[in-house]
Amino acid sequence: MNAETVFQTHRPRLMALAYRLLGSRADAEDVVQDAWLRWSGADPASVRDPEAWLVTTTTRLGLDRLRAARRERVHYVGPWLAEPLAVTLQPDPAPGPAQLHALANDVSVAFLTLLEQLGPEERAAFLLKEAFDHDYREIADLIGHSEANCRQLVHRARQRLQAGRPRFNADASQHRQLLARFMDASQRGDSEAIQALLHANAQLVSDGGGVVTAAIRPLLGAERIGRLFWAIARRGAVHPAQLGYVNGEPAILRFQGDRLHSFTTIEVVDGRIANVYSVLNPEKLPKVVTHRNAAASL
């Protein structure tokens, strides 16, 4: 196989790794493109294992980009939420091989937000172990740490993530039903109906990035969240909404004309909504919402 064919064979895995590491489609695409440029300039005779070479290069480029992004986000206005890979109106009814890996791993907005709690090396070590099934020797080579240190990184990451994850997730049917009811209540501005769906200490996290109006701090408490949607409806600022999918996860898609205005996902704990995540920053929203997932996206 020539260099381009080899690279395209491994590209879905590289994109999946870069996206989980960075939580940004644009940044992940840049990292994978940089990996391609380095691969196309490498001497094929000196590369014994192309996949290992590409994964190593992508991991190290991704870590460099993540460190830079963390410094840049100090100046980001309000909460930072992940930029989606795929926003669709319908799920893929028959996932192909390129999606099987993605569907087995969590790329929900909630989980990507949780990953932001980890340091760059912790995040890389955890993902390489848990999402991509590398052993500790391989992880040590990939991120430039000792095996013992990598074990500690993964252990700490597991502890931190476990503390932030719900003990009992809703099944897919319950999750979608709650989301549909939340969409209906929020479109009507029915504060009481919204509060009935939420945990008392629920939070709403909105990402406008300083580009559009959005809360610059998480809104805490079911009553305050209910009042917010009541106020939005009273002002006549409600946008047409329908259920769709973000990274394969059910989501509320709101439109302004033909343009996606925002999307909202939820996290369900013990039968009620614990967290609401809304991305309004137009720089993170696709220009076109497709009907089905692109197989190579996730």
Question: Which residues does each PLM region occupy?
Answer:
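Short beta-strand edge/turn micro-motifs at domain boundaries
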Residues: 263-293
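Short acidic-hydrophobic surface loop/beta-edge motif
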Residues: 105, 242-244, 254
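A short acidic/small-residue loop/turn micro-motif
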Residues: 45, 258-259, 280-283
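Actinobacteria-biased recognition of intrinsically disordered, low-complexity terminal regions
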Residues: 1-2, 293-298
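Active-site-adjacent scaffolding segments
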Residues: 1-30, 34-36, 40-184, 190-191, ...
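A solvent-exposed, acidic/Ser-Thr-rich amphipathic alpha-helical stretch
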Residues: 200-241
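Hydrophobic pocket/interface hotspot
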Residues: 194, 202, 271
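Short beta-strand segments that buttress and anchor functional surface loops
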Residues: 250-257
